[in-house]
Amino acid sequence: MQSNRRDFLKAQALAASAAAAGIPIVVEAANGTAAPKTAADVAVRWDKAPCRFCGTGCAVMVGVQEGKVVATQGDPEAPVNRGLNCIKGYFLSKIMYGRDRLQTPLLRKKNGVYDKEGDFVPVSWDEAFDIMAAKWKETLKTDGPTGIGMFGSGQWTVWEGYAAAKLWKAGFRSNNLDPNARHCMASAVTGFMRTFGIDEPMGCYDDIEQSDAFVLWGSNMAEMHPILWSRITDRRLSNPHVKVAVLSTYEHRSFDLADQAMIFKPQTDLAILNYIANYIITNKKVNTEFVKKNINFKKGATDIGYGLRPGHALEKDATSNGYPGADGKPKGNPNDSTPISFDEYAKFVSEYTAEKVSEISGVTVEQLKALAELYADPKVKVVSYWTMGFNQHTRGTWANNMVYNIHLLTGKISQPGNGPFSLTGQPSACGTAREVGTFAHRLPADMVVTNPEHRHHAEEIWGLPEGTIPDKIGLHAVAQSRALKDGKLKCYWVTTNNNMQAGPNINGEILPGWRNPKTFIVVSDPYPTASAMAADLVLPAAMWVEKEGAFGNAERRTQVWRQQVSAPGEARSDLWQMMEFSKRFKIEDVWTAELIAKKPAVKGKTLFDVLFRNGKVDKYPLADLTKVNAKYIKDYTNDESKAYGFYVQKGLFEEYAEFGRGHGHDLAPFDVYHEVRGLRWPVVDGKETLWRFREGYDPYVKKGEGVKFYGHKDGRANIFALPYQPAAESPDKEYDLWLCTGRVLEHWHTGTMTRRVPELHRAVPEAQLFMHPDDAKARGLQRGMKVKIASRRGEILLAVETKGRNKVPRGLVFVPFFDEGKLINKLTLDATCPISKETDFKKCAVKVVRA
């Protein structure tokens, strides 16, 4: 059988991915030639599901035999990945079957009773929920709703996140709910909201096949989004005019394709962005008509601090960080801005000349000019991609705003092949954390708890009395850790994340709070992670296709899957855990008498009755479950619906969808998603939207409007004047190196799943310290030698790697964070972007010495 060119490219991408992980791939599988079917093959049932890993949203076919997932393969009908998977995707069938899978609740006990210093003992779900409910009720009585908190996930299904938002913000009346997406996507959210007044990318992956240039800012797509990278590679190699520019603080695998490769000093991306804006203006490449019609100019607050504790010297000196000043009043607001003119903006960026920015950043003048010309040339369609390099940044919101500035100045936005695109790291950081609104300040569909109209709208949809949802922003992720340490947060439920490994400054801020005698920590997880082992109660969780789910990917694509197999032992989904836990609370336990008086019908009811058996969520009978899914799986059911007697997922989804329909976040009817490979919202009249804000593509832009940034009432986007500022902590004489943390191709985040896949674990069994050979030589170190890396906060032992995939410049070291045996986040600083509250994991000062 002769392969066509696309098959060849797929085979090459697969082979490269496999080779990187040291795994052999059978040629027939790589080139798409099907092996002859056997009797065993016939017995395997196949069904669609989105991949469990990153936010790309690849789809796979899941093979089930005798109640177990036995195989997965790329879904050839999936528009995102077109049958191709990365190396992690090819081993999805093994992520649920680690030998140490948790199958029963575990509670710390001594002498038969709960004791924070006790050992883990298996208990029943009833006993687990009894102790949980007792701790929650005690805290609600003594501390009120601010004494409890939940740390969720961009890996929650859409309805798990929605159930959590209802339970916390409506049931417990606490906004202390935040997702681990705070660590990865919060700066993207605030960047979108400040510039456009509405969240999530205006473009889609279809841009790749229509663009002339790709610019990567702090994004190693070759390893972190390899399927999208394979599409960019195809575009670049098939079209000689296409260019790729890659900017990073160190050289990684994405540099292999780069026409323009730039290594810049940490934090100086801000200066480079302002230079590009200056170049566009001084060379008269501004799209004047577009700017006049569609843009407002603003100057942002600048002395905003670094999100450290209020007592830190950097926060005491800051004048606009929002912390209480000497008079007890907030010192400004880091999110503030004032209107300016185009001329004032032009003057502001004029100081960022090529020569000055070259000196600041270390990028040559020639490289800077070549990059700026890509953006400035009206004939070149450009897509900018970024991930954690921008977002995990003490000026992450600014970085997002500033890349939008460039696209808005040139009008290269909201059209095929042109646009800025924030890539996502988790499978539903967009669909669940952002769209559902599981952040401490958000409600569904971009609404916020501080807006009385938004609260009222949510209360109407949820059937709640006015005033139920609190108006004060809750604790964000880093603030939750600090509050636990300080004894202000007493009860804490952590699900579908591993913050004891992934969070910043573990020794200084996270572990002390979890082991604080005043706190009670619950972790829901499939495996005994670092977080689970530090908890007081561990709840075994179902994962991926052990439940019915939905994810929303980076291009606004919502994808649904059916439950394929049962979870082992007594493991249960996060959705079941939250709904079941809600039964333990009468409304009198959580609401004030005044609030209950506004709706007497709720008296004596449980939170389950009020939130989930409310006439809307329980609207759809079990017959719908069979009707929607019967042609795919005979006698289909799912565990949650079977437990509660109604189609739980459909009820939650349709209630949630009320928030977005008619408000620019329209979702299709629930049943439709079971038939298709996802749809990109807004979905209006059955049609998905590929490009937002532009007439002819977006149903919310009327005929004759051309471009309309309807997130803002005036239909305009904002360009912000924002300066380059240094990092919160920089190398000095003692701690003389920058530390950057991140990921590798073979492992995902903290390795909870990938390190339990034997092939992936063998490929990269432990984390290493990537160091420049000259830096190693100057310290008397050799490749493979054990060293101690230390910051002001902690130290760990690692082996030095002076070769390999990551080539760091002198003065910087890189360490991935997947290895629970080498907790690099003991060293990181808990500084955040003061606007987004997202942690900067890319910059702190360390030293390296022989162990």
Curated annotation (Swiss-Prot):
Its EC number is 1.9.6.1. Binds 1 [4Fe-4S] cluster. Binds 1 molybdenum-bis(molybdopterin guanine dinucleotide) (Mo-bis-MGD) cofactor per subunit. Predicted to be exported by the Tat system. The position of the signal peptide cleavage has not been experimentally proven. Its cofactor is [4Fe-4S] cluster; Mo-bis(molybdopterin guanine dinucleotide). Substrate binds at F817. It comes from Leptothrix cholodnii (strain ATCC 51168 / LMG 8142 / SP-6) (Leptothrix discophora (strain SP-6)). Residues 44-100 form the 4Fe-4S Mo/W bis-MGD-type domain. Residues 1-29 form the signal peptide. It catalyses: 2 Fe(II)-[cytochrome] + nitrate + 2 H(+) = 2 Fe(III)-[cytochrome] + nitrite + H2O. This is Periplasmic nitrate reductase. The keyword Protease does not apply.
